[in-house]
From Swiss-Prot:
Cell compartments where the protein resides: Cell membrane
Organism, scientific name: Burkholderia pseudomallei (strain 1710b)
Keywords in alphabetical order: Cell membrane, Membrane, Transmembrane, Transmembrane helix, Virulence
Main location, first listed in the record: membrane
Name by which UniProt lists this protein: Secretion apparatus protein BsaZ
Sequence intervals crossing the membrane: 28-48, 80-100, 137-157, 175-195
Family: Belongs to the type III secretion exporter family.
Region (Disordered) residue spans: 341-411
Gene: bsaZ
Amino acid sequence: MAEKTEKPTAKKLRDAAKKGQTFKARDIVALIVIATGALAAPALVDLTRIAAEFVRIASTGAQPNPGAYAFAWAKLFLRIAAPFVLLCAAAGALPSLVQSRFTLAVESIRFDLTALDPVKGMKRLFSWRSAKDAVKALLYVGVFALTVRVFAGLYHADVFGLFRARPALLGHMWIVLTVRLVLLFLLCALPVLILDAAVEYFLYHRELKMDKHEVKQEYKESEGNHEIKSKRREIHQELLSEEIKANVEQSDFIVANPTHIAIGVYVNPDIVPIPFVSVRETNARALAVIRHAEACGVPVVRNVALARSIYRNSPRRYSFVSHDDIDGVMRVLIWLGEVEAANRGGPPPETRALTSAEPQARDGVAPPGDACADNAFPDDAPPGAAAPNAGSPDGPAPDGGAPARTGDQNA
């Protein structure tokens, strides 16, 4: 068997917590409960109320009803003891929940017959934890002897003075001295409690240590095999259906947000003179659309305002571009035509721009950009000259060069 030298992983600790194997400093919890009870006893346990009940019964002079007598004493006991018990229970439950990180050990509730195994019982009897408990018991005996010695030296006069105390103060003085004795014992036992918690923490992690094979196996179970993980990543990257891919390839251009919205615009004047939305995706699918368009050579125009406007005004795929966005789409189409013409060294193709009659099908809107299209290439321009505004719809390209098909169109 391989030596367990690796620290327990987070998953190992979570699984152990579900089985009830958590770090438990029981003595610290006991210290908190005892200290809480000692400090709360003088305020919650009032012996004068008990004495007053005796006085009330004796002053009546009549034989009390046994049922009513028992009920009165039970009610008085609950009034005195219930707040004290509830406070001590809360003081013990809260540290226990904090130590277990508020994890409910559901599996530890089941009946386990292996706990009755005598072999495992012998192993627990001669384990490191049993040796620790034996040493701790001897230390507590020494702490108790030290506590009695210190208490006798400090409060022996008060203890012997109880013989001369008035009966009305006798109960209160006993409670005060008992509380002082308990707090003094806890103070003397504090080093032992801290040492016990440190050793318990060490033994807890020692029992949950893992060998290297267990760590690798757990990593494979949680993260998956490297080949399987790579295949899963490839499958997750297939965000686009074949239909959307075909729509991207047939689009005239893609206008992007640039990372959260991708809108495909398709124009075919022979069928419909108005552009319509062929692709409409957001977030991860928008990035996939942009990557696929760049791979297929479809122009990608990064124009935040236009992309948001089309996305807002055209709520569905295969719907026409709204009246408010016609001008922006036309500018992009004219710009792309000029870019293609500049790259080929010829005039821009007429199929990239709507004819003068086509925009009239959209509420009589005049074709935007006609002046730019008419003046893009003067008659006396040399062959291969780029359009004056080939860089963008509003200005020339930097350094006089022809811009690429994928550009930035932040209006």
